[in-house]
């Protein structure tokens, strides 16, 4: 049995219900592929998370914390509060030239979250060696063609698969 899980933002979390059903029926999954949110759900399942664990994770995670880079106002100095989040142009600290940020949201929060979730396999760089072999799909922003990722850091692969160029 092979599973291919597509993207679709939060709609991709519907696969959690499918995985819970697969677990309840004791169906053995032989391999998984996914893109975007489907890669996150599928990748976590491939490394050993069960459907009920993914359900709990989906329900109990403060997704807005991870999908934005908003800093709580109590962490910003009084002097900075008036200016916080006000400008769409950054000053490059190396060249001192103004420019646009690389992305509206740089994704550091979600990257850290994915690193935490995938820590159990941080030492495995070949995704075929996971409990369930896994591949995720991203898009090469230069060519616009799909790229299949099955080696390297799982957290980075998942983050790459869910990226939206210039936005996230």
Q: Model-found features: residue ranges?
A:
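Patatin-like phospholipase
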Residues: 1-35, 43-168
């Amino acid at each position: 049995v092979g599973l291919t899980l597509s993207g679709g933002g939060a709609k991709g979390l519907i696969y959690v219900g499918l995985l819970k059903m697969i677990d309840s029926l004791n169906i053995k999954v032989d391999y998984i592929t996914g893109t975007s949110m489907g890669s996150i759900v599928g990748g976590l399942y491939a490394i050993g998370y069960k459907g009920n664990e993914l359900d709990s994770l989906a329900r109990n995670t403060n997704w807005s914390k991870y999908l934005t880079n908003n800093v709580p106002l109590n962490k910003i100095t009084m002097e900075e509060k008036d200016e916080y989040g006000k400008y769409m142009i950054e000053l490059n600290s190396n060249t001192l030239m103004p420019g646009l940020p690389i992305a509206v949201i740089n994704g550091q929060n979600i990257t850290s979250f994915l690193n935490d979730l995938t820590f159990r396999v941080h030492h495995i760089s070949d995704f075929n060696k996971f409990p369930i072999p896994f591949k995720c799909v991203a898009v090469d922003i230069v060519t616009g063609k799909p790229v299949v990722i099955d080696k390297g850091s799982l957290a980075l692969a998942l983050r790459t698969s869910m990226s939206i160029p210039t936005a996230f």
